[in-house]
Amino acid sequence: MKAGIHPNYKKVMVKCACGNEFESGSVKDEVRVEICSACHPFYTGRQKFASAAGRVDKFNKKYGLK
C-alpha cells in the first residue's frame, strides 16, 4: 500500500435511532443508523406480517382484484 493516501481508520461509536450504542471501526468521526440488531424485527423476533398483508389488500382494492 502507498503511504499517506489512505484515510485513518479508527474506532467510533455507532448510535442507533432506538438509543442503542456500540463500538465499531470507520473513517468517519460518528456513525448514526436508523436500525440496528437491537431493534431490527429479524433479530428481535417481533416480525410484523400485518403491514405486508395491508399493502396487498390496498393493491387488490385499488385494481379491483379479489
Swiss-Prot record:
Required co-factors: Zn(2+)
A Gene Ontology BP annotation from the UniProt entry: translation
PROSITE patterns documented for this protein: RIBOSOMAL_L31
A cellular-component GO term for this protein: ribonucleoprotein complex
Keyword Transferase included in the entry's annotation: no
A Pfam family of this chain: Ribosomal_L31
Binding site for Zn(2+): 16, 18, 36, 39
Record SUPFAM superfamilies: L28p-like
UniProt-listed Gene3D superfamilies: Ribosomal protein L31
GO molecular function, one term: rRNA binding
Origin: domain of life: Bacteria
Classification via InterPro entries: Ribosomal_bL28/bL31-like_sf, Ribosomal_bL31, Ribosomal_bL31_A, Ribosomal_bL31_sf
Keywords: Metal-binding, Ribonucleoprotein, Ribosomal protein, RNA-binding, rRNA-binding, Zinc
Cofactor note: Binds 1 zinc ion per subunit.
Function as written in the Swiss-Prot or TrEMBL entry: Binds the 23S rRNA.
HAMAP family named in the record: Ribosomal_bL31_1 (MF_00501)
Subunit description: Part of the 50S ribosomal subunit.
Entry similarity comment: Belongs to the bacterial ribosomal protein bL31 family. Type A subfamily.
The protein, known as: Large ribosomal subunit protein bL31
Organism whose genome encodes this protein: Anoxybacillus flavithermus (strain DSM 21510 / WK1)
